[in-house]
From Swiss-Prot:
Belongs to the NAD-dependent glycerol-3-phosphate dehydrogenase family. This is Glycerol-3-phosphate dehydrogenase [NAD(P)+]. NCBIfam families: PRK00094.1-2, PRK00094.1-4. One of its GO terms (cellular component) is cytosol. Sn-glycerol 3-phosphate binds at K106, G136, K191, D244, S254, R255, N256. The gene is gpsA. Its EC number is 1.1.1.94. The active site is at K191 (proton acceptor). GO terms for molecular function: glycerol-3-phosphate dehydrogenase [NAD(P)+] activity; NAD binding. GO terms for biological process: carbohydrate metabolic process; glycerol-3-phosphate biosynthetic process; glycerol-3-phosphate catabolic process; glycerophospholipid metabolic process; phospholipid biosynthetic process. It comes from Corynebacterium aurimucosum (strain ATCC 700975 / DSM 44827 / CIP 107346 / CN-1) (Corynebacterium nigricans). It is an enzyme of class 1 (oxidoreductase). Keywords: Cytoplasm, Lipid biosynthesis, Lipid metabolism, NAD, NADP, Nucleotide-binding, Oxidoreductase, Phospholipid biosynthesis, Phospholipid metabolism.
Length: 332
């Protein structure tokens, strides 16, 4: 049994708290708001993000980071990617010295173009071999409902990856290990942008041929970027690559796909945000940082560039489609 701290009580953080508790660990969950922590402790549910889904009574929620982090063997960071650094700067003195730090945030930091593992290493002042990434086709609601799913735990220290794997192995949740942190992170961050494109296409009423084209060519550009940054190309054919991409691009539970769908129907960014409970999809933010990261790495990412144009440069979805279909002919 491990002591696990989950820092962030959103839908995915809460779901993973349940997973680790169901796997037999001692789990503490940090929530920003007192009323949410109280609901988790007394009613054993998260009414804001996972209403009516029962949580294990063993999960102890707190608004005090020190309480949540005390004696933790595994610390899971579940806050939005663009807030991770600011939170870590406050939490760093509280982190247990030998704990494995696990990122479940999927994005690229706008200010630095750093991956989340790099943000953790920098802001917390820890060595990279203590940092792991959990990524895969893991829609929070389905996992919380105990529908069978698998994921990848990536860490350069194989022993740490295996320790997290063992701790996360609930009856309905099967973790695999991997040492390719960069590949897992690039796959997780970029798939949100491709899911926006799939949502836009669905909003325009386009069919399966279009979706399959976006997913397949999206995977190609994700792989190009990942390999240029040092990732193993085989990672992108696995759970953290193709698996995560298919789930996020296909499911109506995907916030990024839903957001893109609203844009495809002619909605503005503001209207799409309102339709997703006031939350901007991660892919909207990531399209900017990933597009700039691709430019810096001199990697062509046409779908990402097209989504960036819609989200940040006022390009219409119709014009985006015309531009993508009119690109110079090339070999696959």
């Amino acid at each position: 049994m491990a002591n696990v701290a989950v820092m962030g009580a959103g839908s995915w953080g809460t779901t993973l708290a349940k997973v680790f508790a169901d796997a037999g660990n001692d789990v503490r969950l940090w929530a920003r708001r007192e009323e949410l922590a109280e609901a988790i402790n007394t009613r054993h549910e998260n009414p804001d993000y996972l209403p009516e889904l029962p949580l294990p009574e063993s999960i102890k929620a707190s608004t005090d980071p020190a309480t949540a982090l005390q004696s933790a063997d595994i610390v899971i960071f579940g806050v939005p990617s663009q807030t991770l650094r600011g939170n870590l700067e406050k939490w760093a003195p509280l982190l247990p010295e030998e704990a494995t730090l696990v990122s479940i945030s999927k994005g690229v930091e706008k200010a630095t173009l750093n991956l989340m593992s790099e943000v953790i290493a920098d802001a917390a002042g820890v060595s990279s071999d203590r940092i792991a990434v959990l990524s895969g086709p893991n829609l929070a609601k389905e996992v919380a409902q105990e529908q069978p799913a698998a994921t990848v735990i990536a860490c350069s220290d194989a022993a740490r990856a295996e320790a997290v794997q063992h701790a996360a192995a609930a009856p309905y949740f099967r973790p695999y290990t991997n040492t390719d942190v960069i590949g897992a992170e690039i796959g997780g961050a970029c798939k949100n942008v491709i899911a926006l494109a799939c949502g836009m296409a669905a909003g325009k009423g386009l069919g399966n041929n279009t979706m399959a084209t976006i997913i397949t060519r999206g995977l190609a550009e994700i792989t190009r970027l990942g390999v240029k940054l040092g990732a193993d190309p085989f990672t992108f054919s696995g759970l953290a690559g193709m698996g995560d991409l298919v789930a996020t691009c296909s499911s109506t539970l995907s916030r990024n796909r839903t957001f893109g769908y609203r844009l495809g129907q002619g909605g503005t960014l503001e209207e799409a945000t309102a339709a997703t409970n006031g939350q901007v999809a991660e892919g909207v933010i990531s399209s900017d940082s990933i597009f700039r990261l691709a430019q810096r790495a001199d990697v062509e990412m046409p779908i990402t560039q097209a989504v960036y144009g819609v989200c940040h440069r006022g390009v219409t979805v119709d014009d985006m489609i015309v531009a993508l279909m009119g690109r110079t002919k090339k070999a696959e």
